[in-house]
Amino acid sequence: MRKIIHIDMDCFYAAVEMRDNPALREVPLAIGGSADRRGVISTCNYVARRFGVRSAMPSALARKLCPPLVLIPGRMAVYKEVSRLLRAIFLRYTEQVEPLSLDEAYLDVTMSPCCGGSATLMAREIRAAINTELGLTASAGVAPNKFLAKLASEQRKPDGLFVIRPQEVDEFVRQLPLGKLPGIGRKTADRLESLGLYSCEDARQLGNEELIARFGKLGEMLAGRIWGHDEQPVQAQRVRKTIGVETTLASDVLDEAACWQVLRQLIPELEQRFSVSHGKEQLMGQGIKLKFADFQQTTVYRRGGYQPERFHDLLHEGLLRAQGKPIRLLGLVVGLPAAGEVNQLALDLA
């Protein structure tokens, strides 16, 4: 049986700012782009959350909800350095560390001799070290696999620890709403609910074969998760799959020509980024990202050799999906080869 710890820092960027400037601790604080330049909130402290401010919210809306909000652009170099120190703490307990972002990681401590092999005690020590050495707090979840460990870390936020022991997995998962499972978004949850499936117990009653027959690949994932199964390993070396660039527009646009003009200006930056590590002939595909004025988004991606002019065709398809909704953000992405994968330029899988 594996022992997995999920560590999630509490409102990380804002917490670093409050640590370094105590005057910010009791005021509503957010890190993000300027409201005057259509910025978006990256994170906020719990004081701001009481006003309804949330991550990914337009800064202008955050200002309306919370007029006294202190909005700062953030200090990415500082956050990266704190993240480096955070990782150093993790490595005292195991080499099997999979960072998900600057402030979140999985640790596989199955074979760790620390704390007599107790994952719970290791999680407690890690949280104490983060508080003592970095002046920050973290929430932790301990469970037999990754998806349960992540769910566990959400149970006692902020600054808490929750453990799901092997013998507790079935009961914990049984009552979970399906919408809480990783990979289940609002639309998928609505689809499941239309069939009378609200909880993992409901899905169990339907049966694995029926889930797979109705939902295909999604059903295969559900068939494992509703029983608490997840065999995904903690990946100490995560392979980057894509490289992209994006920009938020000064004002929403509808016109395809205007969108294409923006994308053409992004292409040189994209090519500069991927050329550091990959040649054009190595790329496995390309795509565009559109975010609409209502903050819904879509990505149009096609496998095959890199052709800059193809972005125009992808843009056209993306705008058809938009169904007249104004565009607030545009982005480009290219797919990188997996280890040992050969790009067959003549084969266009689009």
UniProtKB/Swiss-Prot annotation:
UmuC domain segment(s): 4-185
The reaction(s) this protein catalyses: DNA(n) + a 2'-deoxyribonucleoside 5'-triphosphate = DNA(n+1) + diphosphate
Gene3D superfamilies tied to this protein: 3.30.70.270, 3.40.1170.60, 5' to 3' exonuclease, C-terminal subdomain, DNA polymerase, Y-family, little finger domain
Required co-factors: Mg(2+)
UniProt-annotated location(s): Cytoplasm
Cited NCBIfam families: PRK02406.1
Described purpose of this protein according to its UniProt entry: Poorly processive, error-prone DNA polymerase involved in untargeted mutagenesis. Copies undamaged DNA at stalled replication forks, which arise in vivo from mismatched or misaligned primer ends. These misaligned primers can be extended by PolIV. Exhibits no 3'-5' exonuclease (proofreading) activity. May be involved in translesional synthesis, in conjunction with the beta clamp from PolIII.
Family annotation (HAMAP family): DNApol_IV
The name this protein goes by in its record: DNA polymerase IV
Organism classification: Bacteria, Pseudomonadati, Pseudomonadota, Gammaproteobacteria, Aeromonadales
Gene: dinB
